[in-house]
Amino acid sequence: TDVVISPGSRNAPLSMAFHQASVKGLINLHIRIDERTAAFFALGIAKASGRPVPIVCTSGTAVANYHPAVLEASHTNIPLLVLTADRPASLRKTGANQTTEQARIFGKAVRYFADVSGSVYPMELPFNSLQSGPVHLNIQFEEPLVGDKSDNWLNDLTISAPKVFDRKAPGTFYTKSTRGVLAIGHDRGGLSAEAVKEFAEKLGWPVIAEDPLTFENATSHASVFLTSKTIADDL
């Protein structure tokens, strides 16, 4: 059985339980930070294997990122077990941070929904009577979310060496060019905004930025701007 988890705070009890199952060799545990990516990754596993794949996320807007994959699973009758962590019902509609209305958030796209508030929850229908497709269990957790503060779980982690990327320092790009333009993506190639700004000022080149708020006097929406044939010819 494969399980795909997107780490978070409220789903810590589920994450730790599945981690222990993984250590015992009972499941194949996959970690994906982005919930939308995680859901489609799980959808692919379920489609290839024909087995239900649980996806686990924290509360709030994280749940909404599952929606596209849940719809796809519904349309194609692919078994997907959506496990979403939630705050207790008493905190709903109180203005608590990130308290999204998660109950029935996927509407009719799921074959079954349960808002689980206790350790024992009677299912209204046997799962084997349901048509294949996504099932949503919204599980409420009260704090404390973690049972103890020991470091025993750290023994099961595999520590890998950090990846080192060789990034050229600003000032070494295109030094033989007298005219040019700097097209800056969201991550700026790993360089700081100050370094890019200094580099642009040194060369006297204009900046086209995907994130214009980071730079003063920058042309915004680089991906759209640079796909214009007229502008490309002018450049």
Report residues per predicted region:
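N-terminal glycine-rich anion-binding loops that anchor highly charged ligand groups
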Residues: 2-16
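Glycine-rich, anion-gripping cofactor-binding loops and their flanking helix/strand elements
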Residues: 47, 59, 65, 184-235
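Conserved thiamine diphosphate
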Residues: 51, 89, 97-133
